[in-house]
Amino acid sequence: AFSPLSVMVDYDAENGWACKLLPVVCGVLTVPLPSARRFYKFGKSLRQAILSYPEDIKVAIAGTGGLSHQVHGEGCGFNNPAWDAEFMERLEQDPESLLDMTVTELARLGGWEGAEVVMWLMMRGALSAKVECTHKTYFLPSMCPIATMILEERSDDLPAEAPAETVARANRDYAGAEDLAGTYPF
């Protein structure tokens, strides 16, 4: 799936983007590839960090990466629209059913580059358990499907650790670090 940021967010040459951006870059095409579960857990940690932020801010999380496709070898040109539809449905309704899938299983269903769906799992991990899909499209123009989903939170479930506890733990872990001679941790 492609994410043309310039279509979704205003940009001008003088002031830059109309919002603050924090890209999280994930390498998913060379081994060792982190597991689907690990990407999902990273998303859960990202949610914890966002909820612990001291200001009340609006946050949008974009998960990018191709659905089924393969661009090399004898499998070049492979697509699996049925798997793409199943993945998108499970991502919305039951993301944890995807977490024990191996990289090999993801590649078998979606082509080697189709394992990029783990980045969608990172985004989903950052959302509450209950979401509503308010927009979904899927188009297969050639080598790689183009798909979008907008998932909106429908519950306020909080992580196991309260946001204030996360902040207190971070402050405790780094207390005094600024006083270490010859180091610049902040």
Language-model region placement:
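Beta-strand elements within well-structured catalytic alpha/beta cores of enzymes
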Residues: V24, I57-L67
